[in-house]
């Protein structure tokens, strides 16, 4: 007895693959990448110190991802090798965030359409622009915080689609409450502590349920430092993270005794 032939239209086939990939990405924890005055900030909820969801790719380029770890780790290492080869063969300035994002989009898109299983990943390629002159006193920052700075944020989805974001990127998990919270709090040109507190608060948002409180040990945080020369990627350790996350009033109180004990005078001897 022969088995009946089952036909699925190409549209249904692609819808099934998309749903499969989206469900896999949603099972992970969220990641936020946002612009701030000093560069680009990465904040990921990550309870495993041995596994990184945020990392360096090249001099002024960073990488963040959500979804299946082994799949985006393969993409990360491939991106590092590709960037190193291009920088060595041509010039380091030829390694740009736009070029790398396009390379990732082609690879992920091919896997989505040709392989048996699509990658359950969503990635962000971020590039920080060169140092810029200080903004004149009283001058407002740009509406989106990016024009004139050279900062770039690219989101590459599981199907290879690529979108350039102008303010922030949210990936993984149940991200609608996170996006809503960041849309409400985002300010162009905000400083690092303000941006960090807003990102962590957004990651703890759960919609109608009470917000979650995330500890510094549950976070992976890094920046692309605009003022740095050469490699700009810097990880923020848990001790410094706790200080940056402290409310402004608490931080001022903590700094007051140190200021009284160590007045601003030249060292003697």
Curated annotation (Swiss-Prot):
InterPro entries: Ntn_hydrolases_N, Proteasome_alpha-type, Proteasome_asu_bac, Proteasome_sua/b. Gene3D superfamilies: Glutamine Phosphoribosylpyrophosphate, subunit 1, domain 1. The formation of the proteasomal ATPase ARC-20S proteasome complex, likely via the docking of the C-termini of ARC into the intersubunit pockets in the alpha-rings, may trigger opening of the gate for substrate entry. Interconversion between the open-gate and close-gate conformations leads to a dynamic regulation of the 20S proteasome proteolysis activity. GO terms for cellular component: cytoplasm; proteasome core complex, alpha-subunit complex. Its main location: cytoplasm. GO terms for molecular function: threonine-type endopeptidase activity. GO terms for biological process: modification-dependent protein catabolic process; proteasomal protein catabolic process. Residues 130-139 have a biased composition (Pro residues). It is found in: Cytoplasm. The keyword Cytoplasm applies. Keywords: Cytoplasm, Proteasome. Pathway: Protein degradation; proteasomal Pup-dependent pathway. PROSITE patterns: PROTEASOME_ALPHA_2. Residues 130-150 are annotated as: Disordered. Belongs to the peptidase T1A family. HAMAP family: Proteasome_A_B. Component of the proteasome core, a large protease complex with broad specificity involved in protein degradation. The 20S proteasome core is composed of 14 alpha and 14 beta subunits that assemble into four stacked heptameric rings, resulting in a barrel-shaped structure. The two inner rings, each composed of seven catalytic beta subunits, are sandwiched by two outer rings, each composed of seven alpha subunits. The catalytic chamber with the active sites is on the inside of the barrel. Has a gated structure, the ends of the cylinder being occluded by the N-termini of the alpha-subunits. Is capped by the proteasome-associated ATPase, ARC. This is Proteasome subunit alpha. It comes from Nakamurella multipartita (strain ATCC 700099 / DSM 44233 / CIP 104796 / JCM 9543 / NBRC 105858 / Y-104).
